[in-house]
C-alpha cells in the first residue's frame, strides 16, 4: 500500500477534528493544531502522490509524515495521560501511533514501490 493512500485521509481527519474542536469548544488551539498539522500531512501526501505519478519516491514527504505523526502521538498521548479523555486525545494518539508505525515501515522498505512497466 502506498503512503498517500492513508496519508491524505489521515490529514483530512486531522483538519476536520480541528474544526470540530473549534466549533464545539471555541478552541483556537484545536483549530490551529488540527488544521495546521492536517494541512501539512495532506501536503506531504500530495507531494508523495505526485512523485509516485512520476515513478519516483519521495523520502522527504514520508519523513515529514513520520515526524508529524510521531509528534501527534507524543503530544496527544501526554494529553490523554493528563485528562484520561478518550475524545480527542486517545483517539488521535492511537491513530497517529498506527500511522507512525506505517510510515516507519514504508521508510524501512524503501518507500512506495514503483511497479515495473508492462511491455
Curated annotation (Swiss-Prot):
Subcellular localization, as worded in the UniProt entry: Membrane
Top-level taxonomic group: Eukaryota
Pfam families named among the record's database cross-references: Tmemb_14
CC terms in the record's Gene Ontology section: membrane
Any GO BP: cellular response to hypoxia
Keywords for this protein: Membrane, Transmembrane, Transmembrane helix
Transmembrane segments: 27-47, 57-77, 85-105
Principal localisation: membrane
Record membrane topology: Multi-pass membrane protein
Note in the entry: For all TMEM14 proteins, 4 hydrophobic alpha-helical domains are predicted. However, NMR structure determination of the human TMEM14A showed that only 3 of these helices are membrane-spaning while the amphiphilic N-terminal helix is probably located at the lipid micelle-water interface.
Function: May be involved in free fatty acids export.
Family to which this protein belongs: Belongs to the TMEM14 family.
The protein, known as: Protein FATTY ACID EXPORT 5
Lineage of source species: Eukaryota, Viridiplantae, Streptophyta, Embryophyta, Tracheophyta
Amino acid at each position: 500500500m502506498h503512503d498517500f493512500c492513508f496519508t491524505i485521509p489521515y490529514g483530512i481527519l486531522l483538519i476536520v477534528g480541528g474544526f470540530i474542536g473549534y466549533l464545539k469548544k471555541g478552541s483556537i488551539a484545536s483549530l490551529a493544531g488540527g488544521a495546521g498539522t492536517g494541512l501539512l500531512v495532506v501536503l506531504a501526501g500530495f507531494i508523495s502522490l505526485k512523485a509516485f505519478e512520476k515513478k519516483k519516491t519521495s523520502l522527504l514527504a514520508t519523513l515529514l509524515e513520520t515526524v508529524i505523526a510521531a509528534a501527534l502521538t507524543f503530544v496527544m498521548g501526554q494529553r490523554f495521560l493528563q485528562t484520561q479523555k478518550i475524545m480527542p486525545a486517545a483517539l488521535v494518539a492511537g491513530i497517529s501511533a498506527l500511522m507512525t508505525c506505517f510510515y516507519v515501515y514504508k521508510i524501512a522498505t524503501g518507500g512506495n514501490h514503483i511497479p515495473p512497466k508492462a511491455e
